[in-house]
Curated annotation (Swiss-Prot), chain B:
One of its GO terms (biological process) is protein localization to plasma membrane. Residues 393-403 have a biased composition (Basic and acidic residues). Residues 385-410, 466-492 are annotated as: Disordered. This is Hyccin. Its main location: cytoplasm. It comes from the Eukaryota. The lineage of its organism: Eukaryota, Metazoa, Chordata, Craniata, Vertebrata. It comes from Danio rerio. GO terms for cellular component: cytosol; plasma membrane. It holds the Pfam family Hyccin. Residues 466-484 have a biased composition (Polar residues). Component of a complex required to localize phosphatidylinositol 4-kinase (PI4K) to the plasma membrane. The complex acts as a regulator of phosphatidylinositol 4-phosphate (PtdIns(4)P) synthesis.
Length: 916, 518
C-alpha cells in the first residue's frame, strides 16, 4: 500500500489511529488538529462523528442475525457531527465521500435503510479508489459494501412480480457482499503489514499491542454472508468458489479462526456433497452445469465484477493444487487440524470446562472428517498418526480413544492397539465389542494367549448384557484354549485345554446355531482331538450354513484323508479350488494328496501350476534373476513339458550343481529395483489372506491394503506358519522364538551374501519358498536327488536360514546317502527351531542308524512331548526302544503309533488358521 | 409386471438398437425425460424370472460400452440393485437365473479396470503434506509438525495407489467375488453426485439387507427375503458406508441412518476395524447436525455465519499458549530465544481466569496489594493476577480458602506491594514477566512452591480488607506453611491480566520478584 503523502505527523497519527481502531485517542488528536487550521474543523467534525459512532458500536455490538432497532439518543451527536461536516461542504472530495459513508452506516444502525441506500448511490461506491487508499479507507469501503448489501436485503422489492428483477437484486446483493469480503481481506492484510512495520519502526517500548483485532459486525457480514446466501439458494458451485477465494487469500491473525472454520466447512461439502466426477480443482473454472446445483435455479456461475485491488493470494511455483475432492478435503482438514491443535485447551480445572468442550467439539469434527477422507482411500497408517495427535483432546473421551485403537488395528500395529483397547475398556466397560477386538488381535500375530484369555473372560462375565456377542465371547475363549493346547508341552495340560476348548465351542454353538464359525471351530477342535466321525458331522453342518467357506472345505478334505478316503478328499479339494483358484493352502494340500493318489507326476504338475499362479499374482522380480529371465522359475514356468521330464543339465552333475547354484545366488543384484514406492500394489487375489474373513494364521493379519508392513510381524508369522505347511503340526510358542532367531540370522546372512534383498512385503517370497520346498519333497519321494537339490537351492536363495530349508537339505543328503551331512543339517535346523518335530524324528532315526540309542531315545521322547499325535515319531521311538531291548515300552509305542496313524490326516489339522 | 411397464421397456429396447452412432449423444440427453422407464427397469431387475431380464442386461451393457458418460451413468444407477440381486441369488444357491446379471457385472468390471489405451488402470492420489506450499497455505505459517517418522517419510508429496491394477475376470468365484464387487462400488461412488434418489435408496436397502440377513436383527427390521447369512468383507462395507454417507447428506435421511446402523451392527459382529472406524466417524460427525429431508432436487446445505473470534476464553491454557508458561522449576526458566518471546507476547496466553467467566467465582490467590498509599489503587486488581492452575476441584479450593491464614497473605502482600510499585507503569505484563524471570538468576528463586502455598480467598476485596486489617506483618514463617494441599505440578504462576479484558482496569503485574524476595 502506498501511504498517502501526509503533510504532518498529526495527520499520520490520525490515520494510524483510524486504521488501528483506536477511537479513544481521536478526540485528543482532533483538538490538536483544530488548533492548527480553521479549515480543519470540518475534518474534525468528521473524525469526531466517526469516532463516536465506532465507540458506540464497540459498546453495543450488533449481533449476527439481529436487526437494528431504531434511532438511539446517543447517536444524535454523531448525526450532528456528520451533518455539520457534510453540509458545510468544505471538505476535500475524499473526505466528503467518507462522511457520506459514515452517514450511511449511521442510517443503517438507526434502521433507516432507504436513506442509507440513497447515500450510497450518491457516493457511487464502485468508483471509489482502492489503489493508493489508506488502510482505514479500505475498511470503510468494505463496511460500506456490506452495509449496502444488508440494506438491500432489508428493503422490500418495489415490484416483486418480475422474477427477473428478483434475480437481479439477488445478484446485486451477492456482488455487494463478495466485494465487501474481498476488500475486507485486503484490508486485513494491509493492517497486518502496517502493524508489523510499525512494530519495527517504533521503539520497542512495551505498549499495548492489539493482538487480535475484532472484526466487527459489518466486516464479518461482508466476509461470510455471500456464501451463506449461495448455499441457501442451492448454488453449491458458487458457494464452493467463494470459500476457495477466501481460503486462497494469505492469512492474517484475524482471519485465522475464520479460515479454520471455512476450511472445515469446505471439507465437509467436498466429502458429503461431491464425488470424483463432479469435482473441479481450485484453479480452474467451475463447470457450467453441475449436478451439485439446484436445477431449478439458474444463476450465473461467474463473477461479474473485477476489483482494482485484490487481496494477496498464495502463489509461487510448484504450488500443490489438489486434483480430486479427497485430496482437497485432506489438505483442508490438515490445515484445519493444525489450527485446532493449537487451540487445544490443556488446563483441566473446572472453570475451563466450557472451553474444553468447545475445543474438543471442533477438533473432534475435524478428526472425524479426516477419518472419513482417509478411510475412503485406505490410508490407515496415516490416519493412526493423525489420531495420535488428537490425544491431546482425548482425556476421558471414549470416542477418540476408540477411533485411535481401530486405526492402529487397521494399520497393523497390533501391540499398541491392544494397549489402547485396554484404556477403552476402562472408559466403557459395558461394551462387549472392545474386548472382542482385543482378543482378535491377541490371537493373531501377537500370540498373547494369557491376555487373550483375560479379554475373553471379560466378555463372558458380562453374561446376558453382551446379547449377541455372548456366542462370540465363547468362541474367542475356545480359540484361546485351543491355541494353548497346541502350545502346551505336557500331555495332561494339553488334554485339559482341549476339553475346555471343546466345551466353549459347544456353548458358542448352542447360543448361536446359525453361526457357521462356531460349528466349524467345534469341528476343528474335534478333529484335533482325533474324534473324526463327530468332526465330520459338524463340518458338514457348517457347510450347510455356509457352502463356500474355504476353511470348512479344507477341513472336510483333511478329515476324509484321515479316514484314508484320499480320492474323495482330492475331489473336495478340487471343488474348493474351483471357487478359490489361487488359494495356496489348498494347493499345497492338493500336492500332497496327488502324491498319494495319482502319482508324483501329477503332483509336479500342480507345483508347476502353483509357480505360474504365483508369477501372475505377485508380479515381482525374483531376486536371483540375473536380469535375463533365465532363472529356474521362469524356465519352469515357460516350459511346457512336465517338470520331471525336464532335463536340468546344469544340475544333474553334482560338481556343476554347486557351481550353477552359486552362479544363481551370486548373480549380481541387477534385478531392476522394484520401486518400493507407492506404486507397488498389493497382489490382487491376496491369496489366502485378506479377503477371507479369517486371514491365514501363517500370513500377516487382516489388513489387505497395508503396504509397508512392519517387518517384524511377517517373518514371525511366516516361519512358524511355514512349519505347519511342511507338516509339523504345532504352532508353538517356541517356534515363534525360533522364527525370530531365523529372521535375525537371515538378515545377517543376506547382508553377507550378494543376493539382492527382497523388496516389499515378505509373504509372496515365503509362498514361493514353500512352493519350491514342496516340489523338493515330491522329488525326494521320487528319488531324484539332483532336482530336489535344485529346488531346495531356490528356496535357500530366498531364505537361507529357514529351518525348513535346512531340514530339506538334510533329507536330500539322506537320499544321497550322506548320513553325516544329513545329521549336520538336521542339527543346524534344530538349533534354529528346537521344536521342529519332523527334524527331530529324522535325526532320531539317523542316530538309531548310528546306534546311538540313548541320544536317539531322548530326542524322540522330546518330540513326542511337543506333539503327541505324531505317529511316525511314536513309531521311531518304538524302534529305538526295541533296539535297546525294552520290548514292553516298544510295544506300547507301536500300538500308539498304529492308533494315531489310523486317524492321521495328510497334513496336520493345525494348518487351518484359527482366528476370530 | 404390469403390461404398461413391459411396453415401456420393450420400447426402450427397440429404440436403442436402431440408433446410429451420431445420434447417441442426443439420445442420452433425452433419456432423462423418460420418467417411467427407470422404475420399470427396476421392476425387471427385481423379478429374477422375467424374460426381459436378459435383453435388458445386454442393453445396459451396450450402454456402458458405448463410452458416452450419460449412458454409463444410466447403467451405473442400477448397480446396487444388480448387486443385491446377484448376492441374494448366490446365497439361495440358485444356480440359474443370475447368469445375465453376473455377466453384466463382470462386463462392467472388465471395462472399468482398463483405461482408454487398454492398460491396466491404477487409481492413485496424492497425499497432501503441510510442509509443501499449496494454494491454501504456506508451510511457515502452520506450526511445526511433530518430528515423527511418519512426518519425515511424508515430507514431500507422495502418490499412493488405492486401487489396482486388477486382473480380468471371466467368472465369479468365491475368491474374487468381493474384489469385483468392491471395485464396482468404487466406480459407483465416483459418480454419486449424478445418481438419482431412487438409486441412493436402493443402495441403502442393499446395505441394510446384506448386513442383517441371517442375524437376529432381521427380525427387528422385518425383512422377509432370504434368511441365510451373506458373507461380506471389510472393504466392501467401507465402500457401502461411503455411499450411505452421501445418501444421508443428500436427502435420504431415514433410509440412510437405518442403513448406517445396520452396517455398523454387522461390522461389530464381524469385528472389522476399518468399517467400524469410518462408520463411527460418520455417525459422530453427523451427530450434532440436524439433517432434514429435502425435497428431491434441492441440495441446500446449512451454513451459518461463524464468529471470527475464537470462542475459547483467553485464560484457558492452550497448546499454543503453553509455550509461554513458566513451569515451577528450581533453576532459571529457559524461555528460548527472544523471538519466541516476542511471539509469546503476541499470543494470548495465560492463566488469568476471568472473574466473570466462571460460574463459581474462582478462587483467587490474591497477592494483592492494597497497602495504603500510592499502591492502593493499583493494587486493586493486582490480585486477580496470580492464579494457579491445578487439577483439583473447586471444592478443595474452597476448603483452602477457609483455611487461609492471614500470615501468608500478609507476607506476600507486602512483598507484592513492593514489587508492584516497581512495576506499576508496566502494562505489557507478559513481556515483562518473562523478561523479569529471565533476569532472575537467583537459584531457587523461582521456587514457586512458596507461592504455591499461597492462600485462596474468595474475592479480592475481602483480601484487601483483611490486609488492611492486619497491619503488622510477621514475615517469618510464611514460606513454610504450605496450606495448600494441592500439589503443584510445576504450574507456573503467571500473573497476567489481559489488557483487553473489559472488566479489569490496567493493572500492574506482580512479577515473580515477589518470591525471590521472600
Amino acid at each position: 500500500m502506498t501511504a498517502r503523502k501526509s503533510g504532518s505527523r498529526l495527520e499520520t497519527e490520525i490515520e494510524r489511529c483510524r486504521s488501528e481502531g483506536q477511537w479513544d485517542k481521536i478526540p485528543e488528536l482532533v483538538r490538536q488538529l483544530s488548533a492548527k487550521l480553521i479549515s480543519n474543523d470540518d475534518l474534525g467534525e468528521l473524525l469526531l462523528g466517526e469516532a463516536k459512532l465506532q465507540q458506540y458500536l464497540k459498546e453495543n455490538p450488533i449481533k449476527q442475525g439481529s436487526s437494528p432497532r431504531g434511532p438511539r439518543p446517543r447517536l444524535q451527536e454523531v448525526r450532528k457531527h456528520l451533518t455539520a461536516a457534510l453540509d458545510r461542504g468544505n471538505l476535500k472530495p475524499e473526505y466528503m465521500q467518507e462522511a457520506s459513508l459514515i452517514m450511511a452506516k449511521l442510517c443503517y444502525v438507526e434502521a433507516d435503510y432507504r436513506e442509507a441506500l440513497n447515500q450510497y448511490s450518491r457516493v457511487n461506491l464502485d468508483e471509489m479508489q482502492l489503489v493508493g487508499a489508506p488502510v482505514y479507507r479500505l475498511s470503510m469501503i468494505a463496511e460500506a459494501y456490506a452495509t449496502k448489501g444488508l440494506c438491500l436485503e432489508k428493503v422490500p422489492m418495489a415490484s416483486p412480480s418480475l422474477s427477473n428483477s428478483i434475480a437481479d437484486k439477488d445478484q446485486e446483493i451477492i456482488t455487494c457482499y463478495e466485494k465487501s469480503g474481498d476488500i475486507a481481506l485486503l484490508y486485513l492484510q494491509e493492517v497486518e503489514k502496517a502493524l508489523s512495520a510499525g512494530i519495527q519502526n517504533r521503539s520497542p517500548k512495551p505498549g499495548p499491542v492489539t493482538q487480535e483485532q475484532e472484526l466487527g459486525y459489518f466486516l464479518e457480514t461482508g466476509l461470510q454472508r455471500a456464501h451463506v446466501i449461495h448455499f441457501k439458494n442451492g448454488n453449491l458451485t458458487r458457494g464452493v468458489g467463494r470459500f476457495r477465494e477466501i481460503l486462497r487469500a494469505v492469512e492474517t491473525r484475524t482471519t485465522q479462526n475464520l479460515r479454520m472454520t471455512i476450511a472445515r466447512q469446505l471439507a465437509e461439502i467436498l466429502l458429503r456433497g461431491m464425488c470424483e466426477q463432479s469435482y473441479w480443482n481450485p484453479l480452474e473454472d467451475p463447470p457450467n452445469q453441475s449436478p451439485l446445483d439446484d436445477p431449478l435455479r439458474h444463476s450465473p456461475h461467474t463473477k461479474d465484477y473485477a476489483l482494482s485491488r485484490r487481496p494477496r493470494i498464495y502463489s509461487g511455483e510448484n504450488l500443490f493444487c489438489p486434483q480430486e475432492n479427497t485430496e482437497e478435503a485432506l489438505l483442508l482438514l490438515l490445515i484445519s487440524e493444525s489450527m485446532a491443535n493449537r487451540d487445544a485447551v490443556l488446563s483441566r480445572i473446572p472453570e475451563h470446562n466450557n472451553d474444553r468442550i468447545i475445543s474438543l467439539q471442533s477438533a473432534s469434527l475435524v478428526y472425524d472428517l479426516l477419518t472419513i477422507a482417509l478411510g475412503r482411500r485406505g490410508q490407515y497408517e496415516m490416519l493412526s498418526e493423525c489420531l495420535e495427535r488428537a490425544m491431546k483432546f482425548a482425556f476421558e473421551e471414549f470416542h477418540l480413544w476408540f477411533q485411535l485403537a481401530l486405526s492402529l488395528m487397521a494399520a497393523g500395529k497390533s501391540a499398541r492397539a491392544v494397549k489402547v483397547l485396554k484404556e477403552c475398556i476402562r472408559l466403557k466397560p459395558d461394551d462387549p465389542t472392545i474386548p472382542l477386538l482385543a482378543v482378535k488381535l491377541c490371537i493373531g500375530n501377537l500370540h498373547w494367549l494369557e491376555e487373550g484369555e483375560r479379554f475373553a473372560k471379560i466378555v463372558i462375565d458380562m453374561g446376558e448384557k453382551a446379547a449377541e456377542f455372548r456366542a462370540k465371547g465363547y468362541l474367542a475363549i475356545g480359540l484361546v484354549y485351543s491355541l494353548k493346547a497346541t502350545d502346551a508341552s505336557l500331555r495332561g495340560m494339553q488334554e485339559e485345554y482341549q476339553k475346555k476348548a471343546l466345551s466353549a465351542f459347544q456353548r458358542a454353538q448352542s447360543l448361536s446355531p446359525t453361526d457357521h464359525l462356531a460349528v466349524f471351530y467345534l469341528a476343528l477342535q474335534l478333529a484335533i482331538s482325533r474324534q473324526i466321525p463327530e468332526a465330520l458331522g459338524y463340518v458338514r453342518q457348517a457347510l450347510q450354513l455356509q457352502g463356500d467357506d474355504v476353511h470348512s472345505l479344507h477341513l472336510l478334505a483333511l478329515l476324509l484323508s484321515a479316514q484314508k478316503h484320499y480320492h474323495d478328499a482330492l475331489n473336495i479339494i478340487e471343488m474348493a479350488l474351483s471357487e478359490y483358484p489361487e488359494n495356496f493352502i489348498l494347493l499345497f494340500t492338493k500336492v500332497k494328496l496327488e502324491t498319494l493318489c495319482r502319482g508324483p507326476e501329477e503332483a509336479l504338475l500342480s507345483c508347476k501350476r502353483m509357480l505360474q499362479i504365483w508369477k501372475s499374482c505377485y508380479n515381482l522380480t525374483n531376486p536371483s534373476d540375473s536380469g535375463r529371465g533365465s532363472s529356474l522359475l521362469d524356465r519352469a514356468v515357460a516350459d511346457r513339458r512336465q517338470l520331471n521330464a525336464m532335463t536340468l543339465p546344469d544340475f544333474s552333475d553334482p560338481e556343476t550343481a554347486s557351481h550353477a547354484s552359486s552362479s544363481l545366488s551370486g548373480s549380481e543384484p541387477v534385478s531392476p529395483l522394484f520401486p518400493l514406492s507407492s506404486l507397488y500394489s498389493p497382489p490382487p487375489p491376496k491369496a489366502t489372506e485378506s479377503n477371507q474373513r479369517r486371514s491365514s494364521h501363517a500370513f500377516c493379519d487382516h489388513a489387505p491394503h497395508r503396504r509397508f508392513s512392519s517387518a517384524s510381524n511377517l517373518p514371525d508369522a511366516f516361519f512358524h506358519g511355514f512349519d505347519s505347511f511342511i507338516g509339523v503340526c504345532s504352532v508353538h510358542a517356541t517356534s515363534i522364538a525360533a522364527s525370530r532367531v531365523e529372521q535375525a540370522l537371515s538378515e545377517v546372512a543376506s547382508s553377507l551374501q550378494s543376493s539382492a534383498p527382497k523388496q516389499g512385503p515378505l509373504h509372496p517370497w515365503m509362498t514361493l519358498a514353500q512352493i519350491w520346498l514342496h516340489a523338493a519333497e515330491v522329488y525326494i519321494g521320487m528319488g531324484k536327488a539332483a532336482e530336489a537339490t535344485a529346488c531346495t537351492q531356490e528356496a535357500a536363495n530366498l531364505f537361507p536360514m529357514s529351518h525348513n530349508v535346512l531340514f530339506m537339505k538334510g533329507q536330500v543328503a539322506e537320499l544321497r546317502g550322506n548320513v553325516d551331512e544329513a545329521k549336520r543339517w538336521y542339527e543346524e535346523a534344530l538349533s534354529i527351531s528346537p521344536t521342529h518335530v519332523k527334524t527331530m524324528q529324522r535325526l532320531g532315526l539317523i542316530l538309531h542308524q548310528l546306534q546311538r540309542y540313548s541320544l536317539a531315545e531322548k530326542i524322540l521322547r522330546d518330540a513326542v512331548q511337543v506333539n503327541s499325535t505324531a505317529h511316525d515319531v511314536w513309531n521311531s521311538l518304538g524302534e529305538v526302544l526295541q533296539a535297546q531291548g525294552n520290548d514292553a515300552a516298544a510295544t506300547e509305542c507301536f500300538l500308539t503309533a498304529l492308533e494315531l496313524e489310523a486317524s492321521c490326516p495328510i497334513l496336520p489339522f493345525t494348518i487351518i488358521p484359527r482366528t476370530l | 409386471m404390469l403390461a404398461m411397464d413391459q411396453g415401456v421397456v420393450e420400447e426402450w429396447l427397440s429404440e436403442f438398437k436402431t440408433l446410429e452412432e451420431t445420434a447417441v449423444y442426443n439420445y442420452a440427453v433425452s433419456l432423462k425425460e423418460k420418467g417411467s422407464l427407470v422404475p420399470a427397469l427396476y421392476k425387471v431387475i427385481r423379478e429374477n424370472y422375467s424374460d426381459l431380464l436378459e435383453p435388458v442386461c445386454h442393453q445396459l451393457f451396450e450402454f456402458y460400452r458405448s463410452g458416452e458418460p450419460r449412458l454409463q451413468r444410466f447403467t451405473l444407477q442400477f448397480l446396487p440393485e444388480l448387486v443385491w440381486s446377484y448376492l441374494s441369488v448366490t446365497a439361495a444357491r440358485d444356480p440359474h437365473c443370475s447368469g445375465c446379471i453376473e455377466a453384466l457385472l463382470l462386463g462392467i468390471y472388465n471395462l472399468e479396470i482398463v483405461d482408454k489405451d487398454g492398460q491396466s488402470k491404477v487409481l492413485s492420489f496424492t497425499i497432501p503434506s503441510l510442509s509443501k506450499p499449496s494454494v491454501y497455505h504456506e508451510p511457515s505459517s502452520i506450526g511445526s509438525l511433530a518430528l515423527t517418522e511418519g512426518a519425515l517419510a511424508n515430507h514431500g508429496l507422495s502418490r499412493v495407489v488405492y486401487s489396482g491394477p486388477h486382473l480380468q475376470r471371466e467368472t465369479f468365484t468365491a475368491q474374487n467375488r468381493f474384489e469385483v464387487l468392491t471395485f464396482l462400488l468404487l466406480c459407483y461412488n465416483a459418480s454419486l453426485s449424478y445418481m438419482s434418489g431412487s438409486s441412493l435408496q436402493s443402495l441403502c436397502q442393499l446395505s441394510s439387507r446384506v448386513s442383517i440377513c441371517g442375524y437376529p436383527r432381521q427380525q427387528v427390521r422385518r425383512y422377509k427375503g432370504i434368511s441365510s447369512r451373506l458373507m461380506v468383507t471389510s472393504e466392501f462395507l467401507v465402500q457401502l458406508i461411503t455411499g450411505i454417507h452421501f445418501a444421508l447428506c443428500n436427502g435420504e435421511v431415514d433410509l440412510g441412518s437405518k442403513a448406517l446402523d445396520d452396517v455398523l451392527y454387522r461390522a461389530q459382529l464381524e469385528l472389522f476395524p476399518e468399517a467400524l472406524l469410518v462408520g463411527n466417524a460418520i455417525k459422530s460427525s453427523l451427530h450434532g447436525a440436524s439433517l432434514k429431508s429435502n425435497k428431491e432436487g434441492t441440495r441446500s446445505i446449512q451454513v451459518e455465519i461463524t464468529p471470527t473470534a475464537s470462542r475459547i476464553s483467553r485464560n484457558a491454557v492452550t497448546s499454543l499458549s503453553i509455550r509461554g508458561h513458566r513451569w515451577k522449576r528450581h533453576d532459571a526458566v529457559d524461555l528460548g530465544s527472544p523471538d519466541e518471546l516476542t511471539e509469546i507476547a503476541e499470543v494470548d496466553e495465560g492463566i488469568c481466569t476471568q472473574a466473570s467467566g466462571a460460574q463459581s467465582s474462582p478462587p483467587t490467590i490474591v497477592i494483592s496489594s492494597s497497602a495504603g498509599g500510592a499502591a492502593a489503587g493499583a493494587g486493586k486488581l493486582a490480585g486477580k493476577g496470580l492464579r494457579r492452575l491445578t487439577g483439583r476441584s473447586s471444592k478443595e479450593k474452597d476448603k483452602e480458602k477457609d483455611a487461609a491464614t492471614g500470615m501468608d497473605q500478609l507476607t506476600r502482600k507486602q512483598a507484592a506491594v513492593r514489587a508492584m510499585s516497581e512495576n506499576l507503569e508496566l502494562l505489557s505484563l507478559k513481556r515483562l514477566t518473562l523478561t523479569a524471570s529471565q533476569s532472575v538468576p537467583k537459584s531457587g528463586s523461582l521456587s514457586l512452591s512458596r507461592t504455591a502455598s499461597a492462600v485462596f480467598s474468595r474475592s479480592f476485596e475481602q483480601v484487601s480488607n483483611v490486609f488492611s486489617g492486619n497491619q503488622p506483618s510477621s514475615r517469618a514463617s510464611s514460606p513454610t506453611s504450605n496450606h495448600v494441599a494441592e500439589q503443584d505440578e510445576g504450574v507456573a504462576y503467571l500473573d497476567h491480566i489481559s489488557p483487553a479484558h473489559q472488566h479489569r482496569q490496567r493493572s500492574p503485574t506482580i512479577s515473580i520478584h515477589v518470591t525471590s524476595d521472600l
